[in-house]
Design a protein with these regions (language model features):
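Basic, helix-initiating cap at the start of DNA-binding domains
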Residues: 1-18, 24-30, 47-50
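C-terminal peripheral helix-coil segments that are non-catalytic and often amphipathic
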Residues: 120, 124-131, 161-185
Length: 185
């Protein structure tokens, strides 16, 4: 990716995080380029939003992979992955508002859902914890997956609305998630 393209995407993220309806003119101004230059790299607003979404997915995947690899204990892996997803989600929350979160069946059927995929690793941890009876076996994995996503969204929303401090939101999210799935640490 060229430096100008990266700069435009960063400017778009900054603008849209504050105001989803900011104009491309405002994004160009924030990036320090002309609108014409912006259109050399992005054909329209939707193209720019797609690029922001892809950037978010790449960064979130990277952060969650790092969180996964940072620990050997599966519970600490899940906790760190939750925190990484909250951090990345907070940085790109406008994307979540513009694109609906995928359902479990859509995620599971995608080609990207391979053995190296961070979601696959997360799901494997959940299945293993369930087999070990460390989490409630009455809950299905799709339910737990959607619950995980909902807790991330709730954490982000609570911080954005000013109801909860950013650091507290992570503690509350982890307490909520482990309680909801009956996690035995």
């Amino acid at each position: 990716m060229t430096d100008v393209r990266i700069k435009i995407i960063a400017a778009a993220v900054k603008c849209f995080l504050v105001n989803e309806s900011d104009t491309l003119e405002k994004v160009a101004q924030e990036a320090g380029v002309s609108r014409r230059t912006l259109h050399r790299y992005f054909k329209d607003r939707q193209d720019l939003l797609e690029s922001c979404k892809n950037e978010m997915l790449d960064r979130c995947n990277k952060a969650m992979t790092e969180a996964y690899e940072s620990e050997n204990d599966p519970i600490k892996k899940v906790k760190n992955m939750l925190f990484a997803a909250i951090e990345q989600g907070a940085n790109y929350s406008f994307i979540k508002r513009l694109y609906e979160r995928s359902s479990f069946s859509e995620v599971e059927s995608r080609k990207e859902f391979g053995s190296n995929n961070v979601k696959s690793k997360w799901l494997t941890i959940m299945k293993n914890l369930q087999k070990e009876r460390r989490i409630n076996d009455e809950l299905t994995i799709p339910w737990i997956f959607n619950l995980f996503g909902s807790i991330i969204e709730t954490s982000i929303y609570a911080v954005e609305s000013g109801d909860v401090a950013r650091n507290d939101s992570k503690t509350f999210a982890w307490t909520s998630f482990k309680g909801a799935i009956g996690l035995k640490e």
